[in-house]
Amino acid sequence: VKDKAFTLIELLVVVAIIGILAAVGVVAYNGYTGAAKVNAAKTNHTNMVKKVSLIIQQCNLDGSVSMMSKWGNKTVFNINCYPNKFTFFSDYLINDMYNSSRWDNPYRAGQNNALQPGWCTNAASGGGGNVGFVWINGRDSMDHVTVCTCTKKPCGSSDILENKIYID
């Protein structure tokens, strides 16, 4: 009677092949998720630039906009445009965006906010610790609103998106 079974060497070869395939798969998966995070950060940035542009156009037409300006409150308020640009863009607009939909930092999903008030230097500071945040800044002394995002570490100049949206 002849037994049919795999030899120890054959089994070790199969285990080695599975290990190699798993290692290649993990590297490919990490590259895929890294690219997805960069793209999500870029999308958040682009959406914020579009929203700021839309708000400025609405202000130019009507002098006021409807926003859910209070954090965690879905009540829509009619807000006069630019009584204080910092409060208007960095408080009311950020609150409206969060109340309208969920914004996550792709690098810290579910842990903290993706939208932050502040200067573009904030996007580049912290040695990459601010990666994924969208920074919004409008000041009374400025004729524009700035939107900045670090899309990937180390948050060097080539990793920062910056848009200035001018207030007409």
State each model region's role.
Residues G34-N73:
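Conserved hydrophobic/amphipathic alpha-helical signal-anchor segments
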Residues K2-T33:
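N-terminal single-pass transmembrane signal-anchor helix
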